[in-house]
């Protein structure tokens, strides 16, 4: 069971402070999720592609190169394979430089369909509804994700 220590709703995003030190920020429109440690200088984002097949690899590689060339981003890891709800997809972890968190700057899209906001970054409609709290728990159900992100933050 996920415990929410603090829930602050603003006009821009939902913010949750987690027991393990993560601050979760969710954009209610694009469903982008950002993760940040208390006092961290960088915001860590996890982008997940659901149902990505081999023929999409070129598009994903182009997307990653685009982020690498953009000075605002620092790609940390990926793409790597993630399995959720029995489905396999590709994911990638990256961070925005500095304290500012900008949801509209997210550049990963599900199979290239940037118009389909429901299949954008991280939150999937596989869980039956786009409830932020359920989606945060869903994200943290990914095996090893917390340890993976902690390692990135500590050593970056």
What are the roles of these predicted feature ranges?
Residues 5-17, 137-140:
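Short aromatic-glycine motifs in intrinsically disordered, low-complexity regions
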Residues 1-7, 31-32, 83-93:
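Short, hydrophobic/aromatic-rich segments at coil-to-beta transitions
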Residues 17, 21, 39-43, 85-87, ...:
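Short, solvent-exposed coil/turn segments at beta-strand boundaries
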Residues 63-117:
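Signature of long, low-cysteine stretches enriched in small and polar/charged residues
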Residues 38-42, 95-98, 126-128:
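Secondary-structure transition/turn motif
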Residues 2, 21-27, 73-76, 89, ...:
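Short glycine-aromatic motifs
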């Amino acid at each position: 069971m996920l415990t929410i220590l603090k829930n602050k709703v603003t006009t821009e995003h939902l913010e949750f402070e987690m027991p393990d030190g993560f601050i979760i920020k969710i954009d209610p429109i694009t469903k982008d999720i950002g993760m940040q440690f208390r006092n961290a200088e960088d915001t860590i984002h996890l982008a997940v592609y659901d149902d990505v097949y081999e023929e999409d690899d070129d598009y994903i590689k182009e997307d990653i190169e685009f982020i690498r060339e953009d000075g605002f981003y620092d790609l940390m890891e990926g793409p790597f394979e993630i399995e959720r709800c029995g489905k396999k997809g590709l994911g990638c972890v990256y961070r925005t430089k500095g304290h500012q968190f900008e949801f509209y700057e997210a550049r990963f899209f599900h199979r290239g369909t940037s118009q389909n906001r429901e299949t954008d970054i991280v939150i999937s409609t596989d869980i039956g509804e786009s409830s932020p709290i359920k989606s945060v728990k869903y994200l943290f159900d990914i095996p090893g994700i917390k340890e993976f992100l902690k390692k990135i933050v500590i050593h970056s």
